[in-house]
């Protein structure tokens, strides 16, 4: 097992998580005793305890006082905060993960875009006005797209959507820069922003779902044209930090 880590705690965390991912510590199984595991990994028991507590908070493990530490089925117990970790663990499966991520974001964004134009159309108009000064670069479009989603999610009346977006942020910023490296993708997005601005100025939230659905289909087709050429390094968090 080859693990790149910046210190003992990072190494221990990656060792345990990779062992869970590769089914060496399968869901429902009991982790080795603390002393045995610390010797196996090569870290102190104090460091190991800190790592185990952190992994338990993230949903990888279940720790109960007086009982052995049990491995969870992380798909059932973890949150969006492990997306980066999954991408690091499985770069070959990263395109599929991105497909799922974009599909989820498209479905959720249709709700908070409509809510934002209904509850705070002036905020939507204000943030959409920025498209007229938007630089035609991948970086600018990726940053603006996230800003737009974040602003409208917050003004939709349900701040939980912002927390969902925050869970996507790291992965989406990297994928977004790649996606928007395509001039055609930037033009497609710009056309969408302009149509959304028209709806916002008219305070027309009713037609937002149809617009979102059309853009979701078209941007999905664009993504399928780009995904196979996506560098695998995009999946790796540390390679992009």
Curated annotation (Swiss-Prot):
Main localization category: cytoplasm
Signal peptide: none
Matches recorded under CDD domains: WHTH_GntR (cd07377)
SMART domains: HTH_GNTR
Alphabetical keyword list: Activator, Cytoplasm, DNA-binding, Fatty acid metabolism, Lipid metabolism, Repressor, Transcription, Transcription regulation
CC per GO annotation: cytoplasm
DNA-binding segment(s): 34-53
Protein's cellular compartments: Cytoplasm
InterPro entries named in the record: FA-response_TF_FadR, FadR_C, TF_FadR/GntR_C, Tscrpt_reg_HTH_GntR, WH-like_DNA-bd_sf, WH_DNA-bd_sf
A Gene Ontology biological process term: regulation of fatty acid metabolic process
SUPFAM superfamilies: GntR ligand-binding domain-like (SSF48008), Winged helix' DNA-binding domain (SSF46785)
Limits of the HTH gntR-type domain: 6-74
NCBIfam families: fadR_gamma (TIGR02812), PRK04984.1 (NF003444)
The protein's name in its UniProt record: Fatty acid metabolism regulator protein
Species for this entry: Shewanella sp. (strain MR-4)
Taxon lineage: Bacteria, Pseudomonadati, Pseudomonadota, Gammaproteobacteria, Alteromonadales
């Amino acid at each position: 097992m080859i693990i790149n880590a910046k210190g003992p705690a990072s190494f221990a965390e990656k060792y345990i998580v990779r062992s869970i991912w590769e089914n060496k510590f399968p869901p429902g199984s009991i982790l080795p005793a603390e002393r045995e595991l610390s010797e196996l990994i090569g870290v102190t028991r104090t460091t190991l305890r800190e790592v185990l507590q952190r992994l338990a908070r993230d949903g990888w493990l279940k720790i109960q006082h007086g009982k052995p530490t049990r491995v969870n089925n992380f798909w059932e117990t973890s949150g969006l905060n492990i997306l980066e970790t999954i991408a690091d663990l499985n770069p070959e499966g990263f395109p599929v993960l991105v497909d799922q991520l974009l599909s989820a974001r498209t479905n959720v964004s249709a709700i908070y875009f409509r809510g934002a134009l209904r509850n705070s159309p002036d905020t939507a108009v204000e943030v959409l006005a920025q498209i007229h000064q938007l630089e035609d670069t991948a970086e600018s479009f990726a940053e603006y797209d996230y800003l737009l989603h974040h602003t409208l999610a917050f003004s939709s009346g349900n701040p939980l959507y912002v927390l969902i977006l925050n869970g996507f942020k790291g992965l989406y910023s990297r994928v977004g820069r790649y996606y928007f490296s395509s001039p055609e993708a930037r033009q497609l997005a710009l056309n969408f922003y302009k149509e959304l601005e028209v709806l916002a100025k008219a305070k027309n939230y009713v037609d937002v779902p149809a617009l979102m659905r059309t853009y979701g289909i078209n941007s999905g087709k664009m993504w399928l044209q780009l995904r196979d050429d996506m560098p695998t390094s995009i999946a790796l968090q540390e390679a992009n930090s």
